[in-house]
Amino acid sequence: MKQETLLKVSGLKMHFDAGKGKTVKAVDGISFHIKEGETFGLVGESGCGKSTTGRVLLRLYEPTEGGVQYRGKHIHKLTEAESFRYNRKIQMIFQDPYASLNPRLTVRDILLEPMEIHGLYGGRKGRLEKVDELLESVGLNRAFANRYPHEFSGGQRQRIGIARALALEPEFIVADEPISALDVSVQAQVVNLLKKLQKEKGLTFLFIAHDLSMVKHISDRIGVMYLGHMVEITASSRLYQEPLHPYTQALLSAIPIPDPDIEDKRKRIILKGELPSPINPPSGCVFRTRCPAAMSICTAKKPVLKEAEEGHYVACHLYDGEVKKEYDEMEVTLQTR
C-alpha cells in the first residue's frame, strides 16, 4: 500500500538576527517530506539546524521563508480552531529528560495537564484511567503516577516524556535527540519502545539525532544536514551501504565497527578545519572548506539537492555531470588563453 505524504517542507529558511546587521542562517533553504507511518531521521553535527527545523514544524518559530504543509495545509496559515487541532496532532519528545518535566508536579499531574487543556476523555475519571494506560504502554508501573520526576532514573524520565507526548493521541511526533542524554545501555530500550509504539499506534516520527549508529535502527529514511543545508536524503539501508555525499561518508566512517579485523583495515575520513559560522557561511558549497573532494566549481556554484539515483538525493557537484562538465570546459578555456 502506497504511503501518503503527511508533512512536506519546501524551501524552508529560518534566520535569526544576531545584532550589528548580522544574521544567523540556522536553516537555509531545505526541502523534504515525511510519509505517513514512517520514521524520518534527521542527522548532523551540533549547530547544523536540525533542532531548529523541528521547532518550526511545532510552530514554535515562524519561518523566514518557505513553508510547511501538514495534510496539504500550510501550518503557519491555520485558523485558530485549526491551530488548536494541529497542536494536538503533533507532539514533541525532548532531549533532556531532567529539564523537560516539571519537578513540582507528580507524574499523574504531568500527564493530566495536556488532557485537561484539550478537554479529552470525558472528564476526570476517564483521564485518570488514561494516565494508567499511558504508563503501562511505556513500560512503567501505574503506581508511579504518585511520584515526582526526581525519583526516577534518566531512562524512566524519558519514558514519562514519551507518555506525555502520547497523552493527546498524536499522529506525528518530533523526537529531538531523545536518547542522547541517556546511558548507552538505556538508549536501545528507548528506541525499541518508540518502534513498538509506532507499530501499535501508527505514529509518524521525525527522529533528530547526531549519532548515526542509533538512527540506523529506527529510521526508514534519513536526511543529512550540514550548516543549515540538506546534503543527502535516502533510505536508511542505502545511506549506510552507499553514502554519496563526502560529509555523510565522513560521518559514517567515524562509527566504530565491533569486528577488530574490519575496524583496523577500513579507512577513516578525517575532516579538516572547523565548522564555519552560520553567520558567515562559505560561498558556493557550504561544505567545501572541509571537503576532501572539493573542486574549484564548489566555490563558485552552490549545489542543488538532486536525485542522483532512484530515491537517493544528494547536493554535491560530484554527481552533477552537466554542471561539472560546463565548469571544467570553462576552466580549460581560461587556461589556454
Residues covered by each model-derived region:
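Short catalytic/signature loops enriched in Gly
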Residues: 3-5, 23, 235-337
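Conserved ABC ATPase "signature" region
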Residues: 74, 116-119, 125-143, 252-253
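Conserved ABC ATPase signature
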Residues: 148-152, 156
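A short, proline-enriched helix->beta-strand linker immediately N-terminal to the Walker B motif
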Residues: 167-171
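P-loop NTP-binding/switch modules centered on Walker-like glycine-rich loops
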Residues: 178-182, 186-264
